[in-house]
C-alpha cells in the first residue's frame, strides 16, 4: 500500500510527447527544465478548499461542513523534492485541514503547524497555452500567481513556511 498518492512514479509529459524536453526549439523548456513542474506553465486555476470540520448533530450522527471552495492558481516552492518531483517550483492548492478538523470525534491535532495547508498538486486541466505562459512577464513579476506570504493567512504561515515563495521572479521585459 502506498503512503501517499505521490509514492508511485507520475505520468509525465514525455510519456506522450517524447521530445518535449529535449527539443531545443522550445526555449522555455530549455531554460526551466528542472526548475518548474510542467503544471506551473501548463495548468489553469483549479479548486481550493478551506475549513473542513466534522462533528455530531443533536442525534449523535456524524456530519461534515466545509467553507465554500474557490478557483485559484498559485505557484509555490516544492517542500518535498523527490526523484520524480525534483522541481524548485510546483503548483500548489489549499487543502481544508485545520486544528479542529476531527474535533467532533474527540481528536485534536497536537501540532497543526507540522503539515502545510498549501500542498503540491497536479491539476487535471493541462493546456498548451495558459495565461502564465503567454509571455515571460505573464509569470515573472506577477505576484498574483505566486504563493507569497501575503497570500497565506497569518495563522497558516508557520505551517507553510517551506512552501511560501520569498521573492517573485523579476520581470524580464519579454
Describe the residue ranges of each PLM region.
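C-type cytochrome heme-c attachment and multiheme electron-transfer modules
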Residues: 1-174
Amino acid at each position: 500500500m502506498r503512503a501517499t498518492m505521490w509514492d508511485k512514479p507520475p505520468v509525465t509529459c514525455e510519456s506522450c510527447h517524447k521530445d518535449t524536453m529535449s527539443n531545443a526549439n522550445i526555449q522555455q523548456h530549455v531554460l526551466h527544465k528542472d526548475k518548474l513542474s510542467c503544471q506551473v506553465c501548463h495548468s489553469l486555476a483549479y479548486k481550493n478548499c478551506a475549513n473542513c470540520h466534522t462533528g455530531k448533530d443533536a442525534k449523535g450522527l456524524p456530519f461534515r461542513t466545509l467553507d465554500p471552495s474557490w478557483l485559484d492558481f498559485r505557484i509555490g516552492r516544492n517542500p518535498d523534492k523527490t526523484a520524480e518531483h525534483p522541481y524548485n517550483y510546483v503548483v500548489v492548492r489549499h487543502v481544508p485541514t485545520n486544528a479542529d478538523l476531527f474535533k467532533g470525534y474527540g481528536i485534536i491535532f497536537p501540532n497543526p503547524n507540522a503539515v502545510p495547508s498549501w500542498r503540491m498538486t497536479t491539476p487535471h486541466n493541462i493546456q498548451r497555452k495558459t495565461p502564465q505562459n503567454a509571455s515571460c512577464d505573464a509569470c515573472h513579476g506577477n505576484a498574483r500567481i505566486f504563493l507569497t506570504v501575503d497570500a497565506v493567512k497569518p495563522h497558516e504561515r508557520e505551517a507553510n513556511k517551506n512552501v511560501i515563495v520569498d521573492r517573485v521572479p523579476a520581470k524580464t521585459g519579454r
